[in-house]
Curated annotation (Swiss-Prot):
Any coiled-coil regions, as ranges: 108-423
GO cellular component, one term: Golgi apparatus
Name of the protein described by the UniProt record: Golgin-84
Higher taxonomy: Eukaryota, Metazoa, Ecdysozoa, Arthropoda, Hexapoda
Species of the source: Drosophila melanogaster (Fruit fly)
Topology feature Lumenal, residues: 514-516
Major localization class: Golgi
Transmembrane listed as a keyword: yes
The encoding gene: Golgin84
Length: 516
């Protein structure tokens, strides 16, 4: 929009220059009849070109007027100026094109009126330029405001992302600690289960061996009993086949008694065989129980192995995460070292420039003290003011650099604390045990603030310089003591306890002693 308005102003200026040239040529010509026609033609052509240029330039300006309030105001001003210019140019054109005016009646009064109109047009042109400059300033301010808003939104989004990343990192660290603890517990449980499984397998083997031995003994006993029973059954059958007669000899009676005794033994052996069969059934049931228990132990062992595999996978992932965090930490430390190197180089360059400026300032002061000319003194005073201003700017730049150095130093300390924490976590994962560790205080955000009264100025005397130097040294010592106490909480507590004991001792001395 500003380019269109500048184009409009340039076209109006060109047209006015043409009108001035035509008026000058008309005044120089002596023949009025010959000069009226080209003057009329030039004025009509200039008015037509001005109207066309105004229309062509105002149309995009009016279209862009709906975008912002500032553009609307500028279009209003431009439209008013263009209306005035049109009216004046139409009056001048009608004045030139009127049929009543002839070539003989144009005189110096009309030319003077034409010059007055030209002067008014030039004044309006200047006013249009001023409005154009104001409009450009407003547009620049508006662009700067929009740019600042965009930057503020970007800073806010970046701060939110940083907070979110810190929160995610803390959550991941807590989850990692929980995983390490659970892994250690599961490993202990797995070792216990393995020991129990080994002991149960050993017991099962012993019991299977005992059952096999008992089974073999039972089979041998069964075979022997069956043989004895078969022999006795055959003997009983023979005795039954040959019954004894009455009045038989006593040998047969003794044999009958032996057969009865053998029958009794046969019945007892049958009972023992039944008892042995019952014991064999019990042993079989126990063997089945042992087999089922062994199957259950195998199922538990397979589940424990699956758990062990999952835990091993989680442990690998945790180790990979720790390795990535260590690599990120190394990259951050390298970047921090490079930034510190750049900062030290900038500080050295600024210090050398400051020394050069101070030397130049001293040379200028010597020259001012030597010379007595007032004009030279005023010139030197202006130079001295410029040098002092540049010196103040250099000092402010040096202060900014020192503040950035302190911020980078704090970032370095935070990175070191994070690196120590990550190394401690890696050691805990390698040892597979939980151990407590103390974290350093990373809230050391002290920034060196330099009061305005302590700034050295070139107009200070020696006493003021020494006093300000002493104040700066005392301020730096106080800042160092404050950072030391913030960084080490035990020293802070010890100092507080020492001050409290000192006050108690002083109160005890004051209350216990009596005046003479």
């Amino acid at each position: 929009m500003s380019s269109w308005i500048t184009g409009l102003a340039d076209k109006a200026e060109n047209i006015l220059n043409k009108l001035d040239q035509n008026a000058a040529t008309a005044l120089q010509t002596e023949n009025a009849t010959g000069s009226a026609d080209p003057m009329r033609r030039s004025m009509t052509s200039s008015t037509q070109s001005l109207s066309t240029s105004l229309k062509s330039t105002l149309s995009p300006v009016r279209r862009s007027g709906a975008n912002s309030s500032s553009s609307v105001k500028s279009d209003g001003g431009v439209s008013v100026v263009t209306k005035d210019m049109r009216q004046k140019m139409t009056t001048s054109a009608s004045f030139s094109n009127s049929p009543d005016i002839s070539a003989n009646s144009m005189d110096t009064n009309e030319l003077a009126a034409f010059k007055i109109a030209l002067n008014e047009i030039t004044a309006e042109r200047d006013e249009l330029r001023l409005r154009l400059e104001d409009l450009n300033n407003e547009t620049e301010k508006f662009d700067l405001h929009q740019h600042t808003q965009v930057l503020e939104a970007l800073v806010k989004s970046l701060s939110e992302e940083r907070d979110k990343a810190v929160h995610d990192y803390n959550e991941a660290q807590a989850a990692n600690m929980a995983y390490v603890h659970s892994i250690s517990e599961l490993e202990t449980n797995l070792a216990k289960l393995q020991q129990e499984y080994i002991s149960a397998a050993h017991k099962l083997q012993m019991q299977t061996k005992e059952t096999e031995q008992q089974r073999q003994e039972l089979q041998e006993y069964r075979i022997k009993a069956q043989r004895a029973l078969q022999a006795k059954d055959s003997l009983i059958a023979e005795l039954k086949a040959k019954p004894t007669e009455e009045g038989a000899d006593p040998n047969l009676v003794s044999k009958d008694s032996e057969t009865r005794f053998l029958q009794i033994e046969h019945e007892s052996l049958k009972q023992e065989l039944e008892h042995a069969n019952e014991e064999l059934q019990k042993a079989r049931l126990q063997l089945d129980d042992y087999v089922s228990q062994e199957r259950q132990r195998q199922v538990e062992l397979s589940s424990a192995r699956q758990r062990e595999e999952t835990l091993a996978k989680e442990l690998r992932q945790a180790r990979e995460h720790s390795v990535t965090s260590e690599s990120d930490q190394r990259v951050l430390t390298q970047e921090l070292a490079s930034l510190r190197q750049q900062l030290s180089n900038q500080m050295a360059a600024a210090a050398t420039r400051l020394q050069e400026r101070e030397q130049q300032l001293q040379q200028m002061r010597q020259r001012l003290s030597e010379e007595a000319n007032t004009g030279a003194k005023s010139d030197y005073e202006t130079r001295l003011k410029a040098l002092t201003q540049s010196l103040v700017e250099r000092q402010s730049l040096l202060e900014r650099v020192t503040s950035e150095r302190n911020a980078l130093r704090l970032q370095h300390e935070k990175a070191q604390t994070q690196l120590q924490q990550n190394m401690h976590l890696v050691e805990m994962e390698s040892q597979r045990g939980s151990s407590r560790h103390t974290m350093l205080n990373s809230t050391d955000d002290v920034k060196a603030q330099f009061p305005l009264l302590m700034h050295p100025s070139p107009f200070d005397n020696r006493v003021a310089r020494r006093f300000k130097r002493a104040l700066r040294q005392a301020d730096s010592m106080g800042i160092r003591v404050g950072t030391f106490l913030r960084r080490y909480p035990m020293m802070r507590v010890s100092v507080i306890v020492y001050v409290a004991l000192l006050h108690l001792w002083v109160m005890f001395v004051l209350l216990s002693t009596t005046p003479n």
